[in-house]
Amino acid sequence: MREVNFSIPNVNKASVNITTTLYDRRALDCTSTLPLINSLNHLAYLTTSSARIRDILTVDGGIERLVCILKEGRSRDLMEMWKWSLAFQCVVNIGVRGSESVRTRVVEADMVPVIATILDNYIKVVDKARARADSENQRHSSRHHPKAAPAAGDVTGRPSFPDQSSNSEQRTSRRQAPPPSIEIPAFLHQNTNAPDTNAMDVTSSPRAPMTSPPERSTFGQEAHIHRSHDGRHLHTGHRHRAMQPLATALPPMDTADGFGLRPVRDTERLPSMLPTLHNGITSQPDSPTTPNGPVQPRSHAQTSAARQRPTLRQQQSASGDSDDGNGEGSTLGDNAGSAETSEPIVGLQNEMEIDEVSDRQTMIDGVSNSHDLTVTDPSESQEAETFNISHRSTVDGSIINNDTTQTNTALGLSPTQAANNANSPALVPSPYTLYFRDRSAVPQNVLTTMPRDEDVLMSLQLLAYVSKYCNLRSYFQHSHLVPKLKVDRELQMLEEGASPIEPPEEEEEYMLPDDVNIFPLVEKFTVRHHSKDMQYWACVVMRNLCRKDESRGGIRQCAYYKCGKWEEFQRQFAKCRRCRRTKYCSKDCQKAAWVYHRHWCHTTP
């Protein structure tokens, strides 16, 4: 039986391929890597621009073939990695831009296990990098400060929260009467702004000057120490910052600039008088493939003012209510008042102070920042404020000329990255991947298999568009990991002094149980040490989990992933008092879910 590399001699073709004007399903069955890459490159353009091609791929087995390419794993060969990245890009285009039926076919083609494996690999790499950074930091401090090593070890080894009695004393001392009022001159009322005392307020809204120092005014001092002093002060600053309710979820320099009063940003004080700047901040592209406009040079003052990223409630997707994945009733502000409803409310305090010390320790352990890794947000250093990956076709002739000469690509970044496109922001590699790259002991072939930031971003966005259909929720809550995509073996090779590991026997994917829930994996990306784009799309996915199932009478599911209980009738479960979106069947479920829910719980006006 002949191979599927159908040759066409009369047109001088060695194999059937897909072009920007012709789609041929046989090209996806090609066994040679180079013509398959060429076909996938053109297919990525077609899936972006043609709804007809997306519909055809759902009925001719094209999606299943693309998923099979993804499940074969990411090889260390550059061409194989290029093929994998292009196939993944095609599937994301189909799911993001397709209709409801097309998105349903993407989920039914078993794409969810691929996404779950990508997210799980990224979390494992982050944990490994932070563990190594902490160990190196401890060795470094003990070597340079031998006398102070016991004290430093005492600080790092102590739980983030002290015992209950000391915690009560701390809480009591914070609630003492404020000092006398401070007279603020009238001319300062227009140029200064005090930090908000509400620990739950995360948005950037206009605030009135305060007559007394806020409780969290010490954050300016802690942030100052955080940048100017050594590692011992840094540990202490993290410990005191953890004492504040929900203060760990806020960047210290964004909470208070200076020691009390700071100038009001133009975007906070006069949003209506600056329509151009305001629209530029809150705008969202139709999809990750929408190119940006020409970059306009801006002054340093304008750049620093525009770097203030809007909150998740202020961001809207321009693709419409049906495609933004935000769920029903998305909030766009952060007002203090909320409408009265007849539904029961679970009564948690504004500070959400959970009394169990063990729960607090778990909360901090899950989101503690590494003191050696500096996590920089790529989106804050770019002109564009939103996630944008441009798909370029070969019509302009630049993608082949630029990418084929890129043979020494570092970190396993595929040649599909359009780094020379001036209209699209360059995606900065993950700081965790850069951490491993800077260590010369790490083999290069191990780095090539590490998950990339753009893969995680596209995975989260694809989930945001397909997870809003309640009839597909079982695919997300009962999934598995793809064995050939795991990076466990590569992570074991990163251990110091580890000997070469023999490859274990490959597991058959069809024999694996569907015991993986993808929502807890996604919820980990709502933590602040991830980039703003990852947080945004992860929050959209988690809000989709709170949607009511209209096919079952409009009932909702308990938002705690270990519970999963459904309502027997409408409005049986109580909503979270703050966001009024998540529902819990009991106080215990809400308390257990608050460990990560606090990162995507936002006040409803």
Curated annotation (Swiss-Prot):
The lineage of its organism: Eukaryota, Fungi, Dikarya, Ascomycota, Pezizomycotina. Belongs to the MUB1/samB family. Signal peptide: none annotated. GO terms for cellular component: cytoplasm; MUB1-RAD6-UBR2 ubiquitin ligase complex. The gene is samB. Residues 226-241 have a biased composition (Basic residues). A zinc finger (MYND-type) spans 560-601. This is MYND-type zinc finger protein samB. InterPro entries: ARM-type_fold, MYND-type_zinc_finger, Znf_MYND. GO terms for biological process: establishment or maintenance of cell polarity; positive regulation of flocculation; sporulation resulting in formation of a cellular spore; ubiquitin-dependent protein catabolic process. It holds the Pfam family zf-MYND. Keywords: Cytoplasm, Metal-binding, Sporulation, Zinc, Zinc-finger. It is found in: Cytoplasm. One of its GO terms (molecular function) is zinc ion binding. Residues 189-206, 279-306 have a biased composition (Polar residues). Zn(2+) binds at residues 576, 579, 597, 601.
